[in-house]
Amino acid sequence: AALLVALLFVANAAAFRTTITTMEIDEDIDNPRRRGEGCREQIQRQQNLNHCQYYLRQQSRSGGYDEDNQRQHFRQCCQQLSQMDEQCQCEGLRQVVRRQQQQQGLRGEEMEEMVQSARDLPNECGISSQRCEIRRSWF
């Protein structure tokens, strides 16, 4: 009789098994880290870091630029970088420097100034403590 009661108890418990389903609601759908977007897509989404390009171009020139305009490009560059994964920030900045070198034919001291500024941009923006690895020999 005790065996029959135990079997009934087990059968009854099995009949009332509960299934719990959890769902994660992704409210941050615009965040590239959540979408698993690659660097190329992130860079394109940020207009190829056009504000970083303007800012770095002004940084590499001695004088002859509007300081308010430069600050605005710096802020917008930081905004663009903040929307990207850390490793993509550096890749994007390498592309900016490469593009500037090709378009403007930068050499010597101007090129060195641009490379130095680009290396430190994520840190200067306060979005990363990293220093991007950008070598002049790559260009």
Curated annotation (Swiss-Prot):
Region (IgE-binding): 16-30, 29-34, 64-78, 65-73, 95-103, 99-111, 102-114, 105-117, 112-126, 125-136, 125-139
Outcome of mutating L106A: IgE-binding is retained by the immunodominant epitope
Propeptide: 16-31, 58-71, 136-139
InterPro entries assigned to the protein according to its UniProt record, in alphabetical order: Bifun_inhib/LTP/seed_sf, Bifunc_inhib/LTP/seed_store, Napin/2SS/CON
Tissue: Expressed in seed (at protein level). Expressed in the peel of mature seed.
Residues making up the signal peptide according to the UniProt record: 1-15
GO molecular function: nutrient reservoir activity
Keywords associated with the record: Allergen, Disulfide bond, Seed storage protein, Signal, Storage protein
Temperature dependence: Resistant to heat. Retains its alpha-helical fold after heating at 90 degrees Celsius and subsequent cooling to 20 degrees Celsius.
Matches recorded under Gene3D superfamilies: Plant lipid-transfer and hydrophobic proteins
Listed result of changing Q104A: IgE-binding is retained by the immunodominant epitope
GO cellular component, one term: extraorganismal space
Subunit and partners: The mature protein consists of a small chain and a large chain linked by disulfide bonds.
Biological role stated in the UniProt entry: Seed storage protein.
Official protein name in the record: 2S seed storage albumin protein
Organism of this sequence: Juglans regia
